[in-house]
Amino acid sequence: MQNLHIKRPLEPKQAFQYRGRFAPSPSGLLHFGSLIAALASFLDAKAFVNDHGEQGKWLIRIEDIDRPREQKGASTAILTTLEAFGLHWDETALYQSTQSQYYRDILSNLAQQKLSYYCQCTRSQIKAIGGIYQGHCRTANYKSQGNATRLVNQYGLHQFNDLFQDHVVCNKALANEDFIIHRKDGLFAYQLAVVADDIAQGITHVVRGCDLLEPTARQLTLFQTLNNSFLKCTTPRYGHIPLAITSEGYKLSKQNKAPAINNANPQPALIAALIFLGQKSIPDLVSASVEEIIQWAITHWQRDLVPKAFEINID
């Protein structure tokens, strides 16, 4: 097997250390929906204090492996915005574009243990049979050239306990698919990269939007596959917050041209994000500094106040 190039964190201390992360893609600037996710993950990390009196760590990962979708200058702009909003990260920001050899090593080990295979099925072919991949290529022994790589899905994990949404049950048929971990265009699939980097960064908690509930099931399966084969790891706890949507039912996203948040006047958006997250007992913070708002929010953060909903209309 290949030696894995894993950039692991420092040796664990005796007391548990919370390690959360925010992982934006540089396909555009941060919008209000992005701020909600970043703020929730930041507060959940910083409100945690272990037996040694240490706050949780909050890490940044720039998911820049899909180069065709990357907007020039967006990575730097994202970091600038986070700082303007008082969301200061720990350690060095990780760029997925630097992790290629690590991903290749994981793919190589999966192949050696016959836990993956090449597939030439197209999206239209899969859609024609109901939209769920049926493992058609699992025993075909295709070569890598021009084909995607799929994981041999031995577990099909489809339910989990969420930090905010309680018990979540995902689409069982979808969770049992042999899902793609390396695309036919040569790009590493999101599921592979995100799990690999959560392992490398020692992530213990993942807080993000409810649009990623279904992918969580696949990531749980990949964690278990790796842990039971060649890469011992601890699966993070997951928490999913509601999505911010418009009156037309559209999610605030870069694809839907959501407007960027204003670095020059962060306070109103910060307060609006706290209200969105259910942190209702907010004093008059309009005239407070960004640092004062953030410190207040850390001190008063309560997970159980986050709405148990998939989406919330903000109009």
UniProtKB/Swiss-Prot annotation:
Example of a GO MF term: zinc ion binding
InterPro entries registered for this protein in UniProt: Glu-Q_tRNA(Asp)_Synthase, Glu/Gln-tRNA-synth, Glu/Gln-tRNA-synth_Ib_cat-dom, GluQ/Sye, Rossmann-like_a/b/a_fold
Binding residues annotated for L-glutamate, in chain numbering: R21, F22, A23, P24, S25, E63, Y190, R208
GO CC field: cytosol
Cofactor remark: Binds 1 zinc ion per subunit.
Positions contributing to ATP binding: K254
Motif residue range(s): 'KMSKS' region: 251-255
GO biological process: glutamyl-tRNA aminoacylation; tRNA modification
Domain of life: Bacteria
Annotated residues for binding of Zn(2+): C119, C121, Y133, C137
Keyword tags: Aminoacyl-tRNA synthetase, ATP-binding, Ligase, Metal-binding, Nucleotide-binding, Zinc
Motif 'HIGH' region in this chain: 24-34
Required cofactor names: Zn(2+)
Enzyme Commission identifier(s): 6.1.1.-
Leading EC class: ligase
HAMAP family listed in its UniProt record: Glu_Q_tRNA_synth
Listed NCBIfam families: PRK05710.1-3 (NF004314), queuosine_YadB (TIGR03838)
Function: Catalyzes the tRNA-independent activation of glutamate in presence of ATP and the subsequent transfer of glutamate onto a tRNA(Asp). Glutamate is transferred on the 2-amino-5-(4,5-dihydroxy-2-cyclopenten-1-yl) moiety of the queuosine in the wobble position of the QUC anticodon.
Family of the protein in this entry: Belongs to the class-I aminoacyl-tRNA synthetase family. GluQ subfamily.
The name this protein goes by in its record: Glutamyl-Q tRNA(Asp) synthetase
Organism: Colwellia psychrerythraea (strain 34H / ATCC BAA-681) (Vibrio psychroerythus)
